[in-house]
């Protein structure tokens, strides 16, 4: 692929590298950041307007934070060989396979809005702590974290800010001033009377050759070409897919790509009645609409726009009760049957029966459709090594297709777009399943309390500290919670870490006492992380006094008169009463289950291990099923600790577009 260049004007003479004050920068600009080409001239230097600067700031700021411009700029006052500007510094194969031919097309350019999506991107943090080890057991634990709330990681993090070196010390260059850093590129960014000069940094040995044998001017041109390639755009025509190469950061055609360039693998648009033009839904509402649409139980959704409300039919994709819009559409990537594919669209098929919508494989759905069309009374098929018969005698079965929902929280670490620049790939989803536990070397700090705890005044009985979405603990809790609570039905609002020194000390001492009587696997599975649903009015009381077995019976006492905990969040959700604002509350608690036995309604304490001895130890807990326990009941308040509080809500049927 040949790179387009800008012919210099007749009076432009190419000079050897010299101070940038002798050059000027000219570039072609349109209303919304079209491809930028630089032409350096002597004397009169053209500056970009404030509006253009503000439009470019989030783009370049994201590039700086993500490391996309690693090694590009370096201060002029650093000693370096002048010829080093032309030495190879990166080795990148430019022959990228792409199915996107360049062509003229009708499109609209979408300026990235980092306040809507980009702010959710987690950042990598350096750490020197020991690596983690994985031990297969039937429960979860959480990794050790630093005092600032970041997670220990053995992989060294790479920071773009370390490659930016200012000429003058009076110019702000701290990580908190990244918005200022991008204003200091020579001849391009100048604002608020600050000016700083940078040259290309070719000393670092990176893995690509993007700037090999390139002058400073040509390298800056490549930077702007990169910015052009990362811009978002959509086409007005129907039947066009989202470019998967763009999502993976490998589309080299930029705004000339015939496919859509969007933040996520899905994108919602609505068509205006007067102009018959498609316009994108707000970034904040993209995930909301997708989440609601993925639920097969939802057929229509209420929409708000400019003070008016109307309805959208999610089956026919029509809009009614308004004259402003008439149609709705969902842009998506190519389909795939692999549920582990991050970039593809995975379709799920549902058939309605007496109990609601039930998911079936696509092959079974095709059989049901054929039976409906031919008027057959029953459908026979085999699924999961079992034979099934569906009777169609009294009604025609309704069939529906909806995509598998993937939240921004799950997608963003994998996306190579401006709205989803990855920091570090998260662990595979199966790594946080109920069959494994993450055990760092040194689970507590030297002062006996978790390293993630922040300072609390001695007069405080407890505090609740919000858990950052960047923490590994957040991801573990998120995946464990949504393993049984569908993401398209409920959305996590906040996760709080409970700090109560008194309760923690009691719990730790009880754990040490129980561990002295256990060995091997029994000691490992002694501690579990289980859910407990409750109402808002008792959350603070539990955080201060712990779960109290004496007040049992509020919801159920089927397996004993104690405190109930469940492996599945879906079970605990049944006992989580929503507040007046529609918020549900659920604890993820540390529970010492120890040795357990089958429970019964009349038990006020666990039965003895050896009924024939008056000095026999008691069982530590009771369960609903001895072989595959899902519910645990404890009778002592020092066997549990209210570790995290999960606040979540039901997905609303109203979205602002």
UniProtKB/Swiss-Prot annotation:
PROSITE patterns documented for this protein: PARP_CATALYTIC, WWE, ZF_C3H1
UniProt keyword terms in alphabetical order: ADP-ribosylation, Glycosyltransferase, Metal-binding, NAD, Nucleotidyltransferase, Nucleus, Transferase, Zinc, Zinc-finger
ADP-ribosylcysteine: residues bearing it: 39
Zinc finger intervals, C3H1-type: 237-264
Residues covered by region (Disordered): 1-21
Compartment(s) where it occurs, according to its Swiss-Prot or TrEMBL record: Nucleus
Chain location of the short sequence motif Nuclear localization signal per the record: 41-47
Ways its activity is controlled: ADP-ribosyltransferase activity is inhibited by PJ34; inhibition is however not specific to TIPARP and other PARP-domain containing proteins are also inhibited by PJ34. Partially inhibited by KU0058948.
Effect on the protein of changing residue 243 to A: Relocalization to the cytosol
Start-end of Acidic residues biased regions: 1-10
GO molecular function: cis-regulatory region sequence-specific DNA binding; NAD+ poly-ADP-ribosyltransferase activity; NAD+-protein mono-ADP-ribosyltransferase activity; NAD+-protein-aspartate ADP-ribosyltransferase activity; NAD+-protein-cysteine ADP-ribosyltransferase activity; NAD+-protein-glutamate ADP-ribosyltransferase activity; nucleotidyltransferase activity; zinc ion binding
Modification comment: Auto-mono-ADP-ribosylated.
Reactions listed under catalytic activity: L-aspartyl-[protein] + NAD(+) = 4-O-(ADP-D-ribosyl)-L-aspartyl-[protein] + nicotinamide; L-glutamyl-[protein] + NAD(+) = 5-O-(ADP-D-ribosyl)-L-glutamyl-[protein] + nicotinamide; L-cysteinyl-[protein] + NAD(+) = S-(ADP-D-ribosyl)-L-cysteinyl-[protein] + nicotinamide + H(+)
The keyword Ribosomal protein is annotated on this UniProt entry: no
Membership in a protein family: Belongs to the ARTD/PARP family.
Subunit structure: Interacts with AHR.
PANTHER family recorded: POLY [ADP-RIBOSE] POLYMERASE, PROTEIN MONO-ADP-RIBOSYLTRANSFERASE TIPARP
Chain's role: ADP-ribosyltransferase that mediates mono-ADP-ribosylation of glutamate, aspartate and cysteine residues on target proteins. Acts as a negative regulator of AHR by mediating mono-ADP-ribosylation of AHR, leading to inhibit transcription activator activity of AHR.
Entry protein name: Protein mono-ADP-ribosyltransferase TIPARP
Organism: Homo sapiens (Human)
